[in-house]
Amino acid sequence: TWKKVYQSNRPYETTWKVSFPSEKVGYVSIQSYNPDPNVKQQRVAKTTDGGETWKEINLVEDAGARQFGIGFIDEQHGFVGTMNSGYETKDGGLNWSPINLGMACNKIRIYKDANGKVFGYAIGVDVMKY
């Protein structure tokens, strides 16, 4: 049975992509289609209890940074693709830094090989490799 565990309380927002780097910790990208150019704050939702509850965390104040893809290497280190490129966190979403993920990064896939080496792909207008 499916049950609703999160929904933004702001108009023009929808959840888009999800990444669970562990059993308990997960992140969801939140797209904002708000036509008001003064609404700039973009957010991500995070769970630390396996998806039972979600807390919003700030990503960036940029109305043009519409979010698409999201992918995490581990509970702390992850990426969010946006319309104009992307952002990286190394502290579980407390801080975000701009990073080149190409334009309109819609999907981010992170993989680990048998030896634990991490590699990934960010896909949008371009295909970017990590």
Features from the language model and the residues they span:
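Asp-box/BNR beta-propeller loop motif
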Residues: T1-R10, Q42-N58, G86-M103, D126-Y130
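Repeated scaffold domains used in trafficking and secretory/extracellular systems
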Residues: E13-S19, A65-G69, A104-Y111
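Blade-level signature of beta-propeller repeat domains, shared across WD40, Kelch, NHL, RCC1
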Residues: R109-Y130
